UniProtKB/Swiss-Prot annotation:
Signal peptide: none annotated. Positively stimulates PRMT1-induced protein arginine dimethylated arginine methylation. GO terms for cellular component: cytoplasm; nucleoplasm; nucleus; tRNA-splicing ligase complex. It is found in: Nucleus; Cytoplasm. It comes from Mus musculus (Mouse). The keyword Cytoplasm applies. This is Protein FAM98B.
Amino acid sequence: MRGPELGPETSMEGDVLDTLEALGYKGPLLEEQALSKAAEGGLSSPEFSELCIWLGSQIKSLCNLEESITSAGRDDLESFQLEISGFLKEMACPYSVLVSGDIKERLTKKDDCLKLLLFLSTELQALQILQKKKHKNSQLDKNSEICQEVQAVCDALGVPKSDTSDIPLLLSQVESKVKDILCRVQKNHVGKPLLKVDLSSEQAEKLERINDALSCEYECRRRMLMKRLDVTVQSFGWSDRAKAKTDNIARIYQPKRYALSPKTTVTLAHLLAAREDLSKIIRTSSGISREKTACAINKVLMGRVPDRGGRPNEIEPPPPEMPPWQKRQEGGGRGGWGGGGGGRGGGGGGRGGWGGGGGWGGGGGSGGGWGGSGGGGGGRGGFQGRGDYGGRGDYGGRGGYGGRGGYGGRGYGDPYGGGGGGGGGYRRY
């Protein structure tokens, strides 16, 4: 522990006097001259010795120390010095001149005696502060927050003021007053509570933690909104016309602004006091709500917005991306796989297999299965003319892909043969 910083001798005497007065010392050394004279005399001064004993006893009552300062007298100065030395060592005194060196030479100077008094008095003052903080939550006085809240409840209910600070007694008076008031009102005047179960201590602690987390979150949001309010009002003063009225704006705005607190006031008591009607959710845009929230400034800031449309039942359908479907027309076109390719190709369809007006191109056969005069291929035969895969022209008759040459002359034999342009089909020689 660091000792107090020492200045001139007069300043040290003033610090000792101020500390002793704050500690409630009522002895003869509250005068500067008497204190200076006793410090010059040292341990031989009875007033100085009595003050050291008083400070030591007060310190020992607040903390557990083995050493103590009890004896004093001119005949037993050495034992008194030993007690003071042991007491200072146990207190971890930072002044080396008071705890080291020859014990008979330690408290012979006025400055050293003032250091001893200043150390003991400041240590006692620190111990008293710590002791007060320790028992602050257990001992309630009239100025505590709970007493103030209970007293505010008593004032609101008209309970006579009492000098007692007994919280249970005040609460019993409040309870009897509330019951008396409820007997004189309608039955459903207060309503049923929203929370119908009794909370245990564990549930109450959990709700307190939840409320603390929510309060921290909403405090952040409230600070953001308040900052936005400050910036908005500040922007109003940028114009030359408003700069002349800065004082008027501040006089009107600042009292209302300082009344806004970033910390929320919602506690667990609000949950216990909530009624069933609080669970009914009313839309903020409903007619009943807007009767009290609507004002002329909404129309001034926004004005009347024109109708922008956008209703689905009024939107016209988009134009078609594909042409309308049409029924397939009957009759051959230019053939199946080919069209008017080659020589005499093209023409309408006959009774051929793969196509009417020529498969790969040809001059439209009149009949035949895979061949005939108009089948798949061209010329005067489909895939076969008079033979298997060809007649006088496979991929072409007199045009198309070839002349008269196909895969062969009269083919490979009899099957599927045709006469080239006649009755085609499954014809034999």
